[in-house]
């Protein structure tokens, strides 16, 4: 997945990573290595609030990143997200940022991400982000759209 994002982000890497920074509520990012370091260090719970304030509904967060009950438990103990939860948060931030670049509009990107696609057997691109393999398929479609290869 990193290779495909890298191809697209070569045009404006600073802007691409800035979008991800804002969504995750983290310090400056310059590369995928920085994202890997974030996952390894485990993202703070504030990341969930940041994603929520940037277009993800509570239900999407509970479904795709961390279950509601687990989140409540983590908040009470002031624990960070796990590595897996951090990885899912980064995955969603990367793909939603890429969609915003491709469509040039946050609202259009959000609608596209939530609309079922025949290509994904009736699932939405957002649903596909549950797995790394699904995220690669979504990323591939976004890049094809960006370069005029997909309808």
Predicted regions and their residues:
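Non-transmembrane "mature" sequence context
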Residues: 1-151
């Amino acid at each position: 997945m990193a290779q495909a994002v890298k191809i697209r982000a070569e045009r404006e890497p600073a802007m691409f990573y800035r979008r991800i920074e804002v969504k995750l509520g983290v310090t400056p990012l310059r590369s995928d290595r920085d994202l890997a370091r974030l996952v390894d260090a485990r993202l703070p719970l504030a990341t969930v609030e940041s994603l929520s304030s940037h277009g993800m509904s509570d239900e999407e967060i509970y479904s795709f990143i961390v279950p509601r009950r687990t989140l409540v438990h983590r908040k009470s103990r002031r624990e960070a997200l796990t590595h897996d939860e951090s990885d899912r948060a980064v995955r969603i931030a990367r793909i939603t940022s890429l969609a915003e670049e491709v469509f040039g509009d946050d609202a259009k990107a959000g609608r596209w991400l939530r609309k079922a696609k025949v290509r994904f057997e009736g699932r939405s691109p957002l649903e596909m982000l549950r797995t790394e393999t699904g995220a690669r398929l979504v990323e591939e479609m976004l890049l094809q759209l960006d370069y005029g290869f997909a309808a």
